[in-house]
From Swiss-Prot:
Cellular compartments annotated: Cytoplasm
GO biological process, one term: alanyl-tRNA aminoacylation
Keyword Transmembrane: no
Gene: alaS
Organism: Lactiplantibacillus plantarum (strain ATCC BAA-793 / NCIMB 8826 / WCFS1) (Lactobacillus plantarum)
Protein name per UniProt: Alanine--tRNA ligase
InterPro entries found in the cross-reference section: aa-tRNA-synth_II/BPL/LPL, Ala-tRNA-lgiase_IIc, Ala-tRNA-ligase_IIc_anticod-bd, Ala-tRNA-synth_IIc_core, Ala-tRNA-synth_IIc_N, Ala-tRNA_ligase, Ala_tRNA_ligase_euk/bac, DHHA1_dom
Length: 880
């Protein structure tokens, strides 16, 4: 067996398929782009869906990648098994309508067994196939695989519901009898069974059917190959590691954790080993996720990161790590993965800052969680039960980040069990909620074969020409059918040449009209999208008959187009200004460029202050007024990166890219349209800045005429305010408003002082009226005060002087009622609690309330019920 590092193995796989004509596709971000069906990129094929469903035709139908992925559905198994991980890399080779089973199987065998490549012993390899897939079995035999090493398994069929599906073939490596954890006669002791001896290293999916909405399986117009090889598993084979964790992908993290721990060492005992593994695994996932722009929060993928951080911290405590430690593992992860993911190491300082902040935050939450757990244990014991409720264990897990096994361990120390079945019910409900939140969108579309088959060329000339463009009508589609002519109604059209921009990168499509050779308008263009073979597909409203192969004049709506391109150029200036003010960690997370406004989403940890927003706005306007030239060139990706161009949504770029520069200030990969000079924008104004999710902020802004109109409207509003506050000049308005606020505050203080004196005067009369109820003294009165604050002041006075054992006060303010109950410490010890009393009388005023044993309050909407409530207080005390 060769001795290879994880970096060498990864590169060897990519090099092999590059030799077979595959394009090496860079790993996409873990945060999905334009895919609401996924929380995370969870496989290599997840980034290839647009090719497999036919919505985009790739430049090269053969592709290969090493794709970072995250899965958290089995998070509780991480650290307890040899191969469960949250972050993993999936090596894959893909064919979109090119080669199929024969080549995929032949190349897999060559990579695995050739001395030039992996060089594994053929006798240690086993293959499973779908029983009805006789072709796969035949091709495996043709490569030299022994018939008894080919096993038919009914589950070998890949199907995710509607969309591409097909049989698959799994490849297993026999690690030998030393790894066997089952008896010889165990039904799972075979390649494909649940055992440790036969390790699945590769899965080849033969995507050859469309699973239709009706439940039938129809042959795909273009058959595909989708494979997945877990890098971590393959590395464990090469490095003869008992588990994935004893490889160079994890051991440096484990060794660093050993250094930081309280004298703990990996391998000393199984319980500590689980914690070492969990920390190493989660450190990788946390580091990569934050590097890709996800941030800790209480929702979505941010919640996943927060859970992983908290889980790692809790396992750190088991190893004696009482201080923050997780941030110190970030650079270790960066160094391990630097050869293929240099950005992770580059972003280490930023990631460390986020992790350290989250660790500090959790230390506070942890204490709250432990207090809750101790209270739950005490309550369970007091009620005579021996099992902690599953819903309580789930609350600890969901709110405080306590893993189930940790709750079970703490409960076990107190001789209590935990209702695991009840916990699983709550977990399933949570998973169902998450799944339903993403189920409205299709995970992978059905191939639209009509568009895939249309390969007539279509040249986009909109960067240079916008009107009077002569284009031949090559294709007309009506109701998913190619036709030769159309008289009226909606149709889709492809022209030999077009000035109309197709919606892409957040920029909306152009609008406009189509003229015939007589100059008469025959159609309106309402939308333009990219067809799979990169033509511009025009959605048109046909007004007069149009026919295939005729030549038409295409005119873009210039007013619409010019407003859009101003806003697009503004997004580039805004993107760079945000990096300048907030830091290089900010990344574009989405954009929308409309004619009347622009929307820009970006990643950032924390809120953006008013001062920071003002700086951003000023920078953008300074660059507009500097009259910077805007230019674009076409080049290859490598040259573009060397120029310093910012890549947004990297996976969307081909070999040849367009690089847009605004002076020497901004440079980005971009296919959109722009102004010729920044001065054309005139003015830039931020309308709003908000948070829209976990670590994602959104800015909406306007330019040019819309910016002027916004400022004019704000000026008019300011003039109205100036008139209302009688400011002599517009510039005096803030000072005048400040003076009015100061006067108002002084009046409010005077009123509060008067109310306080009045309350004290009332107190004398109120506290004189004391009733005795079965040995408990009670003051229950309706008084006239301005609100709950005054009631609490009276309660403070009552407590100081201890006028009675129990105090009940009520007041009516308009149509609302405020109630307050106070109980002395002695009576609380005797079992009389303010919270119990308030709950008994609050319904009389149509409300509810609660509080501490010594003080409680309530509100209601039935003033007429206040005397009844005060009487009910007497009755309640009499029953105690």
């Amino acid at each position: 067996m060769k001795k290879l590092s994880s970096s060498e193995i990864r590169q060897m796989y990519l090099d092999f398929f590059h030799e077979k004509g595959h394009t090496i596709v860079p790993s996409a971000s873990l945060v999905p782009v334009d895919d609401p069906t996924l929380l995370w990129i969870n496989s290599g094929v997840a980034t290839m869906k647009k090719y497999f469903d036919g919505s985009v035709v790739p430049d090269n139908p053969r592709m290969t990648s090493s794709q970072k992925s995250i899965r958290t559905n089995d998070i509780e198994n991480v650290g307890r098994t040899a191969r469960h991980h949250t972050l993993f890399e999936m090596l894959g080779n893909f064919s979109v309508g090119d080669y199929f089973k024969k080549e995929a199987i032949s190349w897999a065998w060559e990579l695995l067994t050739s001395p030039k490549w992996f060089g594994w012993d053929p006798d240690k390899l086993y293959m499973t196939v779908y029983p009805k897939d006789t072709d796969a079995a035949k091709f495996w035999e043709a490569t030299g695989v022994k018939p008894d090493h080919i096993i038919k398994v009914e589950d070998n069929f890949w199907d995710i519901g509607q969309g591409p599906s097909g049989p698959d073939s799994e490849i297993f490596y026999d690690r030998g009898e030393a790894f066997n954890n089952l008896a010889d006669d165990d039904p799972e002791n075979y390649p494909g069974g649940e055992n440790e001896r036969y390790l699945e290293v590769w899965n080849i999916v033969f995507s050859q059917f469309n699973h239709t909405p009706e439940g039938t399986y129809e042959p795909l117009p273009r058959k595909n190959i989708d494979t997945g090889m877990g890098l971590e598993r393959v590395v464990s084979v090469f490095q003869n590691a008992k588990t994935n964790f004893e490889t160079d992908l994890f051991l440096p993290i484990i060794h660093k954790t050993e250094e930081l721990s309280d004298g703990k060492h990996y391998g000393d005992n199984a319980q500590d080993d689980v914690s070492f593994k969990v920390i190493a695994d989660h450190a990788r996932a946390i580091t990569f996720a934050i590097s890709d722009g996800a941030l800790p929060s209480n929702e979505g993928r941010g919640y996943v990161i927060r859970r992983l951080i908290r889980r790692a911290i809790l396992h750190g405590q088991k190893l004696g790590l009482k201080e923050a430690f997780l941030d110190q593992l970030v650079p270790i992860v960066g160094k391990i993965m630097a050869s293929h993911y240099p950005d992770v190491l580059k972003n280490s300082a930023y990631i460390e800052k986020i992790v350290a902040s989250e660790e500090s935050r959790f230390n506070e939450t942890l204490n709250d969680g432990l207090n809750l757990l101790n209270n739950l244990i005490a309550e369970t014991k007091q009620t005579g039960h021996d099992t902690l409720a599953g819903k309580d264990a789930f609350k600890l897990y969901d709110t405080y980040g306590f893993p189930f096994e940790l709750t079970k361990e703490y409960a076990g120390d107190e001789d209590l069990d935990v209702d695991e079945a009840g916990f699983e019910v709550e977990m399933k409900a949570q998973r169902d909620r998450a799944r339903n939140a993403r189920s409205s969108a299709k995970s992978m579309g059905v191939q639209r074969s009509l568009l895939i088959d249309i390969k007539t060329p279509s040249e986009y000339v909109g960067y240079d020409e916008l009107t009077n463009v002569q284009g031949t009508l090559n294709d007309i589609i009506v109701d998913e059918t190619l036709v030769d002519h159309v008289d009226s109604g909606q149709a889709e059209m492809i022209f030999s040449k077009t000035p109309f921009y197709a919606e892409m990168g957040g920029q909306v499509a152009d609008r406009g009209v189509i003229l015939d050779d007589a100059g008469e308008m025959v159609a309106k263009v309402t939308d333009v999208q990219n067809a799979p073979n990169k033509q511009h597909l025009h959605t048109v409203e046909v007004l007069k008959p149009m026919r295939k192969d005729a030549t038409y004049t295409l005119n873009v709506d210039l007013a619409f187009h010019n407003k859009v391109e101003k806003n697009h150029t503004a997004t580039h200036l805004l993107d760079q200004a945000l990096r300048d003010v907030l830091g290089e960690h900010t990344k574009q997370a989405g954009s929308l460029v409309e004619p009347d406004y622009l929307r820009f989403d970006f990643t950032h940890f924390g809120q953006v202050t008013d001062e920071e927003l003002a700086k951003v706005e000023q920078i953008v306007n300074d660059k507009i007024w500097a009259a910077l030239p805007v230019s674009a060139i076409q080049t290859d990706q490598e040259t573009g990166h060397k120029m310093g161009a910012i890549a947004v949504f990297t996976e969307k770029y081909g070999k040849i890219v367009r690089v847009v520069s605004i002076g020497d200030y901004s440079i980005e990969f971009d296919g959109g349209t722009h102004v010729k000079n920044s001065s054309e924008l005139g003015l830039f104004k931020i309308v709003s800045e908000t948070g829209i999710g976990a670590g994602t902020r959104r800015i909406e802004a306007v330019t040019s005429k819309e910016a002027f109109e916004l400022l004019a409207g704000e000026e008019q509003t300011l003039k109205q305010v100036a008139a209302q506050v009688k400011a002599p000049k517009l510039a005096d308005t803030p000072a005048k408003v400040s003076q009015l606020q100061a006067d108002l505050k002084a009046e409010q203080q005077n009123r509060a002082s008067l109310e306080s004196r009045l309350a004290k005067q009332q107190a004398g009369a109120v506290f004189d009226q004391v009733d005795d109820v079965n040995g408990t003294t009670l003051i229950a009165q309706q008084i006239e005060v301005s609100g709950m604050d005054q009631l609490r002041q009276l309660a403070d006075t009552w407590k100081t002087k201890q006028y009675s054992d129990v105090l009940v006060l009520g007041t009516v303010i308009g149509e609302k009622v405020n109630l307050l109950v106070a109980v002395s410490d002695d009576k609380v010890k005797a079992g009389i609690k303010a919270g119990d009393l308030i709950k008994a009388i609050a319904p009389k005023v149509g409300g509810g309330g609660g509080g501490r044993p010594t003080l409680a309050q309530a509100g209601g909407k039935k003033p007429a019920g206040l005397p009844v409530a005060l009487k009910a207080a007497h009755e309640w005390l009499a029953e105690q």
